[in-house]
From Swiss-Prot:
Superkingdom assignment: Eukaryota
Phylogenetic classification of the source organism: Eukaryota, Metazoa, Spiralia, Lophotrochozoa, Mollusca
Organism per entry: Conus textile (Cloth-of-gold cone)
Function: Omega-conotoxins act at presynaptic membranes, they bind and block voltage-gated calcium channels (Cav).
Protein name from the UniProt record: Omega-conotoxin-like TxO6
Free-text note on domains in this protein's UniProt record: The presence of a 'disulfide through disulfide knot' structurally defines this protein as a knottin.
Signal peptide: 1-22
Amino acid sequence: MKLTCVVIVAVLFLTAWTLVMADDSNNGLANLFSKSRDEMEDPEAAKLEKNYCQEKWDYCPVPFLGSRYCCDGLFCTLFFCA
């Protein structure tokens, strides 16, 4: 019974992880709400407020947080964006 529960939880976790980390070439989910409210009101100001992102092969401080520090399309692995 315990083993069955552990296996079920592991499968659910890995399925969720795969769906979250999957590369969506069409960016289907990202395009649903791609523009924030501020960006729709003043697109120039929104561009200035964007956070700096790390380019390819740049250092990223926390690899297990994924692509939070890397620019779009890059992923943080082994402390650098690739």
